[in-house]
Amino acid sequence: KSTANAMVAKGKGILAADESAKTIQKRFDKIGLKSDPDTNLAYRKMLFTTPGIENYISGVILFDETIRQSIDNVLIPEYLSKKGILPGIKVDKGTVDLPGSLGEKITEGLDGLKERLKEYAQLGAKFAKWRAVITIGQNLPTDKSIEANAEVLTKYAALCQEQDIVPIVEPEVLM
């Protein structure tokens, strides 16, 4: 409960710094930067070491690469925690087409999630994020899509709670 309350502290927000390698590469390509672990870390270090960031940010969603990196020889989750910022982790593995649907999506990542959550908790994660994509359109979403995504989100949330990790459910609605 204290983690959930801290996440929604008045006047603060959650910073999504969970770009995948593919997404961060696209962003860096636009400005002529090469994406590699060192450059990605330098970018995130710039964000996390911003003076006074803790006055505006209650939590940061990290990517798997980032939760394992260090700033000044301190693991990033510990670095953020020392500033009073909750470290979180993106745990879904992206979307694929929902079989038998009209191009609707289902999110992957439940396989091995229990073990990954145990490791992320040991690394200092206090919350996790899982994205489900719901498409709105003519005859969409289908009941099948809603039910399949709800089932996956329920399993994700239950696994998080087993590890004392607060689950964030992110329904991404596409119109």
Predicted regions and their residues:
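Surface-exposed cleft-lining segments at the edges of enzyme active sites
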Residues: 103-104, 134-146, 175
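Hydrophobic residues within beta-strands of alpha/beta enzymes
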Residues: 60, 128, 167-168
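Short glycine-centered, acidic/aromatic-flanked micro-motifs in structured strand/loop junctions
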Residues: 91, 132, 171
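Amphipathic alpha-helical interface segments within eukaryotic helical scaffold
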Residues: 163-166, 171-174
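Structured alpha-helical segments in the cores of large, soluble enzyme domains
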Residues: 113-127, 149-165
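Conserved, mostly hydrophobic/aromatic
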Residues: 36, 130, 169
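Alpha/beta catalytic barrel-like cores
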Residues: 1-123, 136
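Short, active-site-adjacent cap segments at secondary-structure transitions
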Residues: 68, 174-175
